[in-house]
A protein has these predicted regions:
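Residues on the lipid-exposed face of transmembrane beta-strands in outer-membrane beta-barrel proteins
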Residues: 1-6, 64-68, 77, 106-110, ...
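Repeated loop/turn-to-beta-strand initiation elements of outer-membrane beta-barrel proteins
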Residues: 10-15, 72-75, 114-118, 154-158, ...
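Outer-membrane beta-barrel translocator domains and adjoining extracellular loop/strand segments
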Residues: 28-34, 87-94, 129-136, 168-176, ...
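Surface-exposed beta-loop-beta
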Residues: 34-139
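Detector for outer-membrane/organellar transmembrane beta-barrel domains
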Residues: 82, 111-129, 134-210
Length: 269
């Protein structure tokens, strides 16, 4: 487990500071279990993604969050300094690379009518400040707005719109070795979700659908969990990826669609 130091102090804004002594990447698809799209091959590949040690940062990560409640609205300002959590960049030899990343943003959550509304904004500032290096992700502006409410007893629904804007897009396309596979200048994703509880809340049904009109792809996820006692639980579900193009965010994983089932028994300590 990673060691994280935290500090906090109460004043006009509450402050939370986190320091990760050494960069910790996310677990992503690397060809071990699912294939992914490789623009250099112009097709999906199941070859294991190998990241050389020199392309793996060992420097610290820093994160800070300032937050408070104002007139029923939870406001937060946050920042991060570290590296991309997935190896989205490449070195001059085409090998995967974690590039520098600084993120600043804010969020707001408050009751809206019978439900809860949320708003988020973030600016991703990377190494490629003018878009001329196609091996490094461009700076991005990200925006999210969502709403969730209980429709009837035990049935909750939510909707969300998320967008990414790639800065200096024309410059990137002009310098790219494979412009036909580059992400769009503006990517939109609409998310809908339903959550239903039954049988005295021992049965939980959960459905998500992520759909991108700009990429014309999406991801449908369904999960059912039944926990009649504290001793055991059975669950099952489906992950369905769909899309017309093999290089888009969800479309590249179409062949990775799956169904699953699990049983858990909890032993007394």
């Amino acid at each position: 487990p990673a060691e994280i130091s935290k500090g906090g102090k109460d004043f006009e804004f509450e402050v939370s500071v986190e320091v990760m002594p050494e960069f910790e990447p996310d677990n992503g698809i690397n060809g071990e279990y699912f294939s992914y799209f490789n623009p250099m091959l112009a097709e999906n590949t199941g070859a294991r993604m190998v990241i050389p040690d020199e392309n793996k940062p060992d420097d610290p990560e820093y994160a800070m969050r300032l937050y408070r409640s104002v007139a029923g609205t939870e406001l937060a300002i946050y920042g991060y300094k570290g590296f991309t959590k997935l190896p989205e960049a490449a070195d001059e030899l085409g090998r995967p690379l974690y590039s520098d990343l600084t993120v600043t943003g804010f969020s707001a959550i408050r009751p809206v009518g019978p439900g809860i509304g949320k708003l988020e904004y973030a600016f991703h500032d990377g190494d490629d400040t003018d878009g001329s290096n196609p091996l490094i992700p461009n700076d991005q502006t990200r925006f999210l707005i969502g709403y969730e409410q209980e429709l009837v007893a035990n049935l909750t629904a939510g909707v969300q719109w998320y967008t990414e804007f790639n800065h200096d897009f024309d410059v990137r396309i002009a310098n790219s070795s494979w412009p036909q596979f580059e992400a769009t200048e503006r990517r939109h994703v609409f998310t809908t979700q339903l959550r239903y509880q039954a049988l005295q809340q021992t049965l939980v049904l959960h459905a998500f659908n992520f759909w991108s009109p700009t990429d014309d792809d999406g991801f449908l996820r369904f999960r059912a969990t039944y926990s009649p006692t504290d001793k055991w639980q059975v669950s099952g579900g489906m992950n369905l990826f769909y899309g017309d193009e093999a290089h888009t965010f969800y479309g590249q994983f179409e062949d990775a669609s799956n169904v699953y089932a699990s049983f858990r028994y909890f032993f007394e300590g």
